[in-house]
Amino acid sequence: MWPQARLPPHPAMAEETRQSKLAAAKRKLKEYWQRNSPGVPAGAKRNRKTNGSIHETATSGGCHSPGDSATGIHGESPTSSATLKDLESPCQELAVVPDSRSVKVSQLKNTIKSLKQQKKQVVHQLEEEKKANNEKQKAERELEVQIQRLNIQKGKLNTDLYHTKRSLRYFEEESKDLAVRLQHSLQRKGELERALSAVTATQKKKAERQFSSRSKARTEWKLEQSMREQALLKAQLTQLKESLKEVQLERDEYAEHLKGERARWQQRMRKMSQEVCSLKKEKKHDKYRVETLERSLSKLKNQMAEPLPPEPPAVPSEAELQHLRKELERVAGALQAQVEYNQRISLLNEGQKERLREQQERLPEQEERLQQLAEPQNSFKELNNENKSVLQLEQQVKELQEKLGKERLEAASQQKQQLTAQLSLMALPGEGDGGGHLDSEGEEAPRPIPSIPQDLESREAMSSFMDHLEEKADLSELVKKQELRFIQYWQERCHQKIHHLLSEPGGRAKDAALGGGHHQAGAQGGDEDEAAGAAADGIAAYSNYNNGHRKFLAAAHNPADEPGPGAPAPQELGAADKHGDLCEVSLTSSAQGEAREDPLLDKPTAQPIVQDHQEHPGLGNNCCVPFFCWAWLPRRRR
């Protein structure tokens, strides 16, 4: 990985070169001596054998060589003095070399040790640097991975922002379309109210003819029912009185019977206690007699067991012996009879204890029977109170009937005028055309609220007015039923969509989100995170549809909150105002064709809506669906 550091040349290397040069010089000297001398001296051979190192042999040979050579020269052949001088100078140098060599060796060892330590330090530093570099590389890799993840998340967030912007644009377009449809639905509502007012006017005339016969039949039927109820109540009262008398007699008899039984049991208890006391006394007396008899028996046995005196006593007569035997037999029989008597008395005591326990267990049952006998009296009191309340109600009914007769006689003169005025006012919305309703909405005065006439002229007018109110109530109930059906249909659709979004990962979840096909332009990869995001969008739309609906209703209503001429009265539309979370919007013919092609209409939740549209063709040719369901339906781009 890293380049090795180049160290400067150490002085030990120069020393090695010197040693190599010295060795070469020694070799040359040896060769020179071998050439000049015919034979090697014996001292040199011995020194070579004893000293193992080459340096010592060389020094010894170099030191003694001048003398030996001189002797050899003088003995064998004469040599020149110049050569001897030349040889003495290198010998002196060779003698100085061993001392300097040992010093250099020690220095070299020290330098080697220091170099080894430096090498270890350098290796340690290199390892630490390698570890630090590895850690830095790991940190750099982790940072690169995190940067990649952040880039991926950034891309996902950008795609989500793009989809949310598109969905917001889509909902803005939908809101505009829904505002237009709300205006159309309000117009249609005004037309339907006009038709209803015309229908009510025609039905009133029919109801006026039938009210007289109906009212008479109702009053007669109510009177007959009241008479029957009175007869039944009287019969029930008589039966209850008789049953009360019987119950009271039974209760008195049972109380007397209980008193007699209590007295008998008390007498028996007293007798038993007296018998127990007498038995205890007899038992004590019998115990005393048994003890006396036992003492007498022990005395007799002792007398029989005593040894005869040395003097011959007087022999008892046979009559005395027989008398003693008879007494013993009599005492034994009396003891057996006493034991049997005691056993009988213990058995009797146990039986009496069991009877006492049974009587104690029966006492709470008898008390409960007494309480049950006392309950009919309470029920009789309650029935008397109910009968009194019924009589009071009958009196109140009679008084009310009398008051109604008087009011009918007094109101006969004023009813015709009010009915004619009401019929004229209610017939006004039906006379105008439906096309100019919106144009003349601000100029026409609001339709008056149909009020209940205070003074009624005849029973026919009363019946017509009541029938009119009943029809309005029926219509409000139908509206409520339709709203409930739409709510159920919407909830089931939303649950199906959310389940579909959560169960199917990938690109389908985005296609099934709010907006239908408008979200198909996104990324086609389709991860599970994107499916979960689309499901979350659907859930958020499902939870917040009420707020959006109220905003659209506020924008579609009149700014001054004044009803138009074809608008319903506030009293008639109270139920519709309470259910402000729902609103029916008519769709165009193109949307109707698409809805027919939609396979969701084959489901059981969508069938009631189609059936209502087929059963009521007069309500319009366009099918109606709550506006918050429109976002889930396939939408055609106009």
UniProtKB/Swiss-Prot annotation:
Segments of skewed composition (Pro residues): 1-11
GO CC field: cis-Golgi network; Golgi cis cisterna; Golgi cisterna membrane
Record's compositionally biased regions (Low complexity): 561-574
Amino acid composition bias (Gly residues), ranges on this chain: 514-525
Keywords for this protein: Coiled coil
Bias (Polar residues): 50-62
Pfam families: GM130_C, GOLGA2L5
Span list, region Disordered: 1-84, 427-453, 510-532, 556-575
Chain coiled-coil ranges: 105-160, 223-275, 318-417
UniProt keyword Zinc present: no
Segments of skewed composition (Basic and acidic residues): 434-446
Record-stated family: Belongs to the GOLGA8 family.
Protein name (database record): Golgin subfamily A member 8S
Native source organism of the sequence: Homo sapiens
